[in-house]
UniProtKB/Swiss-Prot annotation:
Gene3D superfamilies: 2.40.30.20, ATP synthase alpha/beta chain, C-terminal domain (1.20.150.20), P-loop containing nucleotide triphosphate hydrolases (3.40.50.300)
Location of the protein in the cell: Cell inner membrane
GO molecular function, one term: proton-transporting ATP synthase activity, rotational mechanism
Site (Required for activity): 363
Lineage: Bacteria, Pseudomonadati, Campylobacterota, Epsilonproteobacteria, Campylobacterales
UniProt-recorded name of the protein: ATP synthase subunit alpha
Superkingdom classification of source: Bacteria
Membrane topology: Peripheral membrane protein
Assigned protein family: Belongs to the ATPase alpha/beta chains family.
Principal localisation: membrane
Subunit-level organization: F-type ATPases have 2 components, CF(1) - the catalytic core - and CF(0) - the membrane proton channel. CF(1) has five subunits: alpha(3), beta(3), gamma(1), delta(1), epsilon(1). CF(0) has three main subunits: a(1), b(2) and c(9-12). The alpha and beta chains form an alternating ring which encloses part of the gamma chain. CF(1) is attached to CF(0) by a central stalk formed by the gamma and epsilon chains, while a peripheral stalk is formed by the delta and b chains.
A Pfam family matched in the record: ATP-synt_ab_N
Keywords assigned: ATP synthesis, ATP-binding, Cell inner membrane, Cell membrane, CF(1), Hydrogen ion transport, Ion transport, Membrane, Nucleotide-binding, Translocase, Transport
């Protein structure tokens, strides 16, 4: 009897030993040595990768930014109020990733790609690293397709092409964000996904932007990433990289995307704050030595891909805020040298009622001309020169009252062209309508219209064309060039409208 029991016991023990599984969770763990201002110094993590995501026992997360001989400098997402000396830190062995694809479209996210719009979780299996290598020379193609903003002054004088980087620069309160929002609204029906990255903006300002996009039906094809002024410097620093990762998904899947960084001045300030806390040596204006590189590696990811890669594109419109119109400061000059041109907005023009307040003389597009449609080129070919001569004459008339007839005529024409380029915010104009009104101004159809009535003339001209001659607009849209027949027809239409137009 006792023999049997012993056998039973030994067989049970053997069975248990055979089926025994040890669930052990292997993790590399370090300890926080010090924590201040959103940066933790961690000891005991030797094999950490640069910008690897680390998890704190408090539930906070961060990335390894400084890899030193015996410690790691970790930038903490959020404010890490519960982190203190001795807190455990665990490696995740993965780099920073954000959700990408169509699942993020129409959503408002934070810098980590987490939804903050109260519309539930993002259901997707597609994630992308926020730090990716920019496409090489052989993977690219010259910019040749237009990306129309719907703003006459931009599409005629500083045209933007798909895959271009065009800087919007100016003092605060000059309408920089409005130009960017107009560009987003104008992409409706163009199969372009738009990403708006707000860096260091007020929450109320971002809420206003989202409301505007919803009002014009633009949120259907847009993503908003918000790292507001109340967020930590780490979140403000990461936001543009999260945004560009989402844009790259569409670029690499043979689609088109537009990304707006609003603004990179605040991004540079956030990076300066992080770098100084990490005790990296400061350089000019106390910015670290690699502040140029953080922007160049971000903006180089905007590209027009070659046909073999699917011919997708990512267009970038970075915004930079200047102080008292000083474009020669450190960050503005850096970004001017990285981008393919700039749109310069001026306070004086803004307050004198010329809106959008684009300084035509200082604004330039280095590659967009190749993307401009032929019809726009035909009507705006001499526009820049005419406006420059008008500004010169205008300055001259302040001292001399007696002008010859030719100069008077030029002055009159210039005044009307300035009026033609004025545009209300959030009212982008299709390219065919832009061609018509610029043609009317350039060919003298507005010479007999008083300067104050030019805007009214335009407001009445478009409905007249849509009602009586929709084929003219349709032909400009499809042909993209003003041939002799179309030009003759356009002249006839404008002459007929002038007879019916009463001031």
């Amino acid at each position: 009897m006792s023999q049997l029991k012993l056998e039973e016991i030994s067989s049970v023990i053997e069975e248990k030993i055979k089926n025994f599984e040890l669930d052990c969770d292997m993790a590399e763990v370090g300890k926080v040595v010090s924590y201040a201002d959103g940066v933790a110094k961690v000891y005991g993590l030797n094999g950490v990768m640069s910008y690897e995501v680390l998890e704190f026992e408090t539930g906070d997360k961060g990335v390894a930014a400084n890899l030193e001989e015996d410690s790691v400098g970790v930038i903490v997402f959020g404010f890490g109020n519960n982190i203190k000396e001795g807190t455990s830190v665990k490696r995740t062995k993965s780099l920073m990733k954000v959700p990408v694809g169509d699942a993020v479209v129409g959503r408002v996210l934070n810098a980590l790609g987490e939804p903050i719009d109260g519309k539930g979780e993002i259901e997707t299996n597609e994630f992308s690293l926020i730090e990716q290598k920019a496409p090489g020379i052989m993977d690219r193609k010259s910019v040749h397709e237009p990306l129309q903003t719907g703003i006459k002054a931009i599409d005629a004088l500083v045209p933007i092409g798909r895959g271009q980087r065009e800087l919007i620069i100016g003092d605060k309160q000059t309408g920089k964000t409005t130009v960017a929002i107009d560009a987003i609204i104008n992409q409706k029906g163009q199969n372009v996904i738009c990403i708006y990255v707000a860096i260091g903006q007020k929450e109320s300002t971002v809420a206003q932007v989202v409301r505007k996009l919803e009002e014009y039906g633009a949120m259907e094809y847009s993503v908003v990433i918000n790292a507001s002024a109340s967020d930590s410097a780490a979140m403000q620093y990461l936001a543009p990289y999260s945004g560009v990762a989402m844009g790259e998904y569409f670029r690499d899947h043979a689609r088109h995307a537009l990304i707006i960084y609003d603004d990179l001045s605040k991004h540079a300030v956030a990076y300066r704050e992080i770098s100084l806390i990490l005790r990296r040596p400061p350089g000019r204006e106390a910015f670290p030595g690699d502040v140029f590189y953080i922007h160049s590696r971000l903006l180089e990811r905007a590209a027009k891909l070659c046909d073999e890669k699917g011919a997708g594109s990512l267009t970038a419109l970075p915004i930079v805020e200047t102080q008292a119109g000083d474009v020669s400061a450190y960050i503005p000059t850096n970004i001017i040298s990285i981008t393919d041109g700039q749109i310069f907005l001026e306070t004086d023009l803004f307050y004198s009622g010329i809106r959008p307040a684009i300084n035509v003389g200082l604004s330039v597009s280095r590659v967009g001309g190749a993307a401009q449609i032929k019809a726009t080129k035909q009507v705006s070919g001499t526009l820049r020169l005419d406006l420059a001569q008008y500004r010169e004459l205008q300055a001259f008339t302040q001292f001399a009252s007696d002008l010859d007839e030719a100069s008077k005529k030029q002055l009159e024409r210039g005044q009307r062209m300035v009026e033609v380029l004025k545009q209300a915010p959030y009212s982008p104009l299709p390219i065919e309508k832009q061609v018509v009104i610029i043609y009317a101004g350039a060919k003298g159809f507005l010479d007999s219209v008083s300067v104050k009535k030019v805007v009214d003339f335009e407001e009445q001209l478009h409905p007249f064309l849509e009602a009586k001659y929709p084929q003219v607009l349709e032909e400009i849209h499809t042909k993209k060039v003003l041939d002799k027949d179309l030009e003759a027809m356009l002249r006839k239409v404008l002459e007929e409208f002038k007879l019916t137009y009463s001031e």
